[in-house]
Regions:
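Non-catalytic alpha/beta scaffold blocks inside enzyme catalytic domains
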Residues: 1-226, 280-285
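Long, low-complexity segments enriched in small/aliphatic residues
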Residues: 210-285
Length: 285
C-alpha cells in the first residue's frame, strides 16, 4: 500500500532515491548505494535543491536491526534536519506502532523480556524462537510457529473477525470493522484477556469493547483522534559511529511475511513461483 502511494507521487513528478539493495519498485529511482558507507557519504553533501521542495525520508527495519541501529537512525535524523525533511519509520509488524504507543516495550528488547522467564504469554508473536524451559501460553489465530511451541493455546480471532483499533506506520489511529465471525471456539482477543483476568482473581475493569476503548483513550488520548496523525515532538538521536556493511532487506519472502499469509495455499504457490523465477535463467533472444 505504501509503495503504491510512493509510485503515485513518482507519477506526479517526485524524485525517489534509495540506499539499500537494488530491487524492482515498479518505478524509476536513483540508487544511491547499498549501505552505511553510502549513508555517511550522503551526510557530507549539500542539499540546496532539496530545501525548496517538500521531502520525506523513510527508514526501514533492515537499516535499524543491526547493533548500530540507533546510530543509523541518528544519521538519518541528522540528514532530515539538513534537508528539512519529514521522517517515517517503516515497521515490519502491523501492531508495533500501537504497542509502542501503549508503552509495551522492554529495555533490551524481546530477548531481555523472555530470557529466564518461567512463563511466557505469547500474544501472536510467531517470528521468534522461545528457548526450552518456559511454559508458553499462546494466544493467536493461525497456528503458526508460536502455536507449535506452546503448552496452552487460546484461539483468538484474526483482524478481520473482530472490531479493532489499529495504528499505522505513521502513527494514525484507524478503526477496523469486523468482516466475519471467528470459527470454532475462537473468541475476540480482548474478551480472552478479560475472561482470563477474572479466572486469576484480577478482573479487568471493563465488560464491553466500548468500556475497554474508553479506558484506552484515557491512557493514550491520541487514540481518540481517528484518521489523524498526532504531532510528535522531534527528539534527535545522537548519530554515533556507524558499522560497516550493506543494509540488506528485512523481509526475504514477501508472500510469506506473516502468519495469515503462511497459512494460505495461494500465497505458498506465489512464493514458490517467485523463487522459481529468481533461479531460472532467462534465454537470450
Amino acid at each position: 500500500v505504501l509503495n503504491a502511494r510512493i509510485r503515485k507521487a513518482w507519477s506526479r513528478g517526485a524524485n525517489i532515491g534509495l540506499i539499500g539493495e537494488a530491487v524492482d519498485l515498479t518505478y524509476e529511482y536513483t540508487h544511491m548505494g547499498n549501505g552505511r558507507a553510502d549513508l555517511q557519504s550522503l551526510l557530507k553533501q549539500k542539499f540546496t535543491d532539496m530545501l525548496t521542495l517538500p521531502s520525506l525520508m523513510i527508514v526501514g527495519q533492515a537499516a535499524l536491526q543491526g547493533e548500530d541501529g540507533a546510530s543509523v537512525l541518528g544519521a538519518v535524523m541528522e540528514l532530515c534536519t539538513k534537508t528539512e525533511s519529514k521522517l517515517l519509520v517503516l515497521h515490519s509488524a502491523a501492531s508495533r506502532v500501537g504497542l509502542m504507543d501503549l508503552g509495551c516495550t522492554t529495555e533490551g528488547g524481546v530477548d531481555a523480556a523472555v530470557t529466564g522467564a518461567d512463563v511466557v504469554y505469547n500474544l501472536g508473536v510467531d517470528e521468534m524462537d522461545i528457548a526450552p524451559g518456559a511454559f508458553v501460553i499462546y494466544q493467536g489465530s493461525h497456528g503458526d510457529r508460536g502455536a507449535h511451541r506452546a503448552d496452552v493455546i487460546l484461539p483468538g480471532a484474526t483482524y478481520t473477525e473482530e472490531n479493532g483499533l489499529f495504528v499505522n506506520t505513521e502513527g494514525r489511529p484507524q478503526l477496523a470493522q469486523r468482516a466475519g465471525f471467528a470459527p470454532g471456539q475462537a473468541k475476540e482477543n480482548w474478551a480472552i484477556l478479560r475472561a482470563l483476568s477474572a479466572e486469576l482473581g484480577a478482573t479487568l475493569p471493563y465488560d464491553s469493547l466500548a468500556q475497554l476503548r474508553q479506558a484506552l483513550v484515557t491512557d493514550v488520548p491520541h487514540f481518540a483522534q481517528i484518521d489523524q496523525v498526532p504531532s510528535n515532538e522531534w527528539v534527535a538521536v545522537t548519530a554515533g559511529k556507524l558499522g560497516k556493511g550493506d543494509f540488506g532487506v528485512a523481509i526475504s519472502d514477501y508472500y510469506l511475511s506473516n502468519p495469515i499469509a503462511r497459512a494460505s495455499t495461494l500465497m505458498a504457490e506465489l512464493s514458490a513461483n517467485a523463487k522459481a523465477r529468481a533461479t531460472t535463467p532467462m534465454a537470450a533472444e
